[in-house]
Regions:
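Divalent metal-binding segments
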Residues: 38-51, 60-316, 332, 336-397, ...
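C-terminal motif of bacterial Sec signal peptides marking the signal peptidase cleavage site
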Residues: 18-21
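Acidic (Asp/Glu)-rich catalytic clusters
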Residues: 288-292, 318-329, 410, 431-433
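Bacterial N-terminal signal peptides that target proteins for export
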Residues: 1-9
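His/Asp/Glu-enriched, well-ordered alpha-helical/loop segment
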Residues: 253, 378-415, 420, 425, ...
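Bacterial signal peptide processing site
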Residues: 23-26
Length: 575
């Protein structure tokens, strides 16, 4: 799409060059002839200047520009090619964008970077396979990892287990019986375990379900090998303790894989949405910072353990708070789960599920944290400075989270509710009223309207309409952020942008989607004053793209490539 401001700026520049004789290339910017930078002592001399670009600033006062000048890590000029000449000196590095698009670096305020790239996972199994294929895959993993105390895997979908002819416990026991095995399902909301894992965890047929979790059982009441939600999390905690050098492997994974890949996608700021501080995750991030290896701005969301004593947990969380404004790493968020997920029939709903995987009477899902407990944490931790990232998928879970914030918050926090799959229409306006950020993920295919019918057997046709209602929430005044929940969905922001504008009837404009990935997410991370848009005085977290997103259709946006990513004015990725 042509931009009138850009056309006008280019035209004026061409006229200016014609008058001043600045060369045949009307868009060229040449440093003035001076003996040294000292000759420009009355001016600020830029260290980097970007010219001839289509710069989308996400600043409503100046949406588009041609040129950007940096002094160290700060933006000192945003405007046209002619205006930026005043900031040039002999040492200025001039980068000709050649018409490419520049925009603020992307934020992803909900992802799981440590878990997604962790070396803790020793093997992967298919999402769907026959019982025999699963047995072969798990047995092969045991042969390939002879010294592992626990076999830790990943990859199946829950329905692949629920549709087995035999109990999943019988199948996995046939593969490996002498060592504990735990396999995380793709959403991380259930685990498939063998008998040895149950034994070492102290789980038997008489065990009571833990807070926020369910031990899967067959029709006779026997354990079936599926641990739903927090029931699985507790066993995974035990499995992780068996790993030697886990922190060092996670440290290497962040530096060598995760951060480079995120920078390659144009991402400059993230929130770790589940920092397991009892697994060493916090220390891993802190070591990366200490080693001066961070290439992202990072806010950690400390995991709130649902089974832990509240007073002990609150005291510990307060002690871990870290919010140095000069640091790239901040520990200023807490991650709470209100409920589970729809496909497990554990998302908290007002009305019972039509299909009940858990065989619980009048199953309406479960709570990791009740409304009253969440209120307690809000009252205790807001004063410290924590913002809450609250997992809410079912209409009851979301409603209770809003209730807790309304009853307990002092109003200065920036709490957000994430996922937002089934939202009651009467709760739409409460997001703006309570200053609650609406965080959604649309990069995954399962949130696409074409897949809404998949949930009809679980919650009926009426509740299955309008899942993840980003358009309705925006229309009701909510501050919307878009994120990935990687590795549940791809972290590629261009997939998210493409889906956001094409998921009719809950689609939004490209400008709104970009705001959700930039300035709105910066607001959620309490850094909108320094990043999230391209403005004078802000820090230079920037990304250069191979195309103007506003001139592409939805499918073309998905194919966008990042040419360059800058954090704090320094190039952290270049194609």
């Amino acid at each position: 799409m042509s931009n009138p401001t850009m056309i006008l700026s280019t035209t004026l520049l061409a006229i200016s060059c014609a008058i001043s004789g600045c060369g045949s290339d009307s868009n060229s910017v040449t440093a003035p002839t001076v003996e040294s930078d000292g000759d420009l002592s009355s001016h600020v001399v830029a260290t980097k200047v970007f010219t001839n670009g289509e710069v989308y600033t996400v600043n409503p006062e100046q949406p588009w520009a041609q040129a950007v000048a940096l002094k160290g890590n700060k933006i000192i000029f945003v405007g046209n090619n002619q205006g930026v000449k005043a900031y040039l000196g002999k040492s200025t590095h001039i980068i000709d964008l050649k018409g490419k698009m520049m925009m603020p670096g992307f934020h992803d305020v909900h992802m799981h970077p440590l878990e997604s790239a962790s070396a803790a996972t020793q093997f992967t199994i298919p999402a769907y396979a026959s019982e025999g294929e699963y047995i072969d895959a798990i047995y092969t993993a045991s042969v390939q990892n002879p010294d592992a105390q626990w076999l830790i895997g990943y990859g199946h979908e829950i329905t692949s287990l629920l549709e087995m002819e035999r109990a999943p416990l019988s199948v996995i026991n046939e593969a490996v019986a002498d060592r504990p095995v735990i396999i995380m399902e793709q959403t991380s909301h259930s685990m498939w375990v063998n008998g040895k894992a149950l034994q070492l965890s102290g789980i038997n047929v008489n065990s009571q379900d833990p807070i926020g979790g369910v031990y899967g059982r067959d029709v006779s009441g026997k354990l079936d090998g599926i641990l739903y939600d927090n029931a699985g999390n507790q066993v995974m905690e035990l499995a992780m303790k068996s790993l030697p050098n886990a922190q060092q492997q996670d440290h290497s994974g962040l530096i060598e894989y995760t951060m480079p890949e995120l920078n390659k996608a144009g991402i400059t700021s993230i929130s770790d949405a589940r920092t397991y501080w009892q697994r060493g995750h916090l220390e891993t991030w802190q070591q990366v910072e200490k080693d001066d290896k961070l290439t992202l701005r990072v806010s950690l969301g400390l995991w709130a353990y649902p089974g832990m004593n509240d007073e002990r947990q609150i005291s510990t969380l307060k002690s871990l708070y870290q919010n140095d404004p000069q640091s790239l790493l901040k520990v200023n968020q807490v991650k709470f789960y209100m409920d589970g997920i729809l496909v497990n029939t554990t998302a908290a709903m007002h009305e019972p599920y039509d299909t009940n995987w858990l065989d619980l009477y009048q199953n309406k899902g479960l709570n990791y944290f009740t409304q009253s407990r969440l209120e307690k944490y809000i009252k205790a931790l807001e004063a410290t400075g924590f913002d809450f990232n609250i997992h809410g998928i079912g209409d009851r879970g979301i409603h209770e989270a809003l209730n807790a914030i309304e009853r307990a918050s002092k109003g200065n926090a920036r709490h957000r509710i994430t996922h937002l799959e089934v939202v009651n229409s009467e709760d739409y306006t409460r997001f703006e009223k309570l200053n609650v950020i609406a965080d959604a993920q649309v990069a995954g295919e399962f949130t696409d309207p074409n897949h809404w019918p998949d949930t009809i057997p679980l919650i009926g046709s009426e509740r299955a309409q309008g899942l993840v209602p980003i358009k309705n929430l925006l229309s009701a005044g909510a501050t919307l952020t878009l994120s990935s929940d990687w590795n549940v969905s791809t972290f590629n922001p261009f997939v998210g942008l493409s889906n956001a504008i094409s998921r009719v009837p809950q689609n939004i404009t490209l400008a709104q989607a970009i705001e959700a990935y930039t300035i709105n997410s910066a607001y959620a991370m309490r850094q909108e004053q320094v990043v999230g848009s391209i403005e004078v005085g802000k820090l230079a977290d920037l990304v250069v793209l191979d195309r103007n997103l506003f001139e592409q259709n939805a499918s073309e946006i998905k194919n966008t490539k990042v040419e360059m990513t800058l954090l704090d004015g320094e190039v952290v990725y270049q194609r």
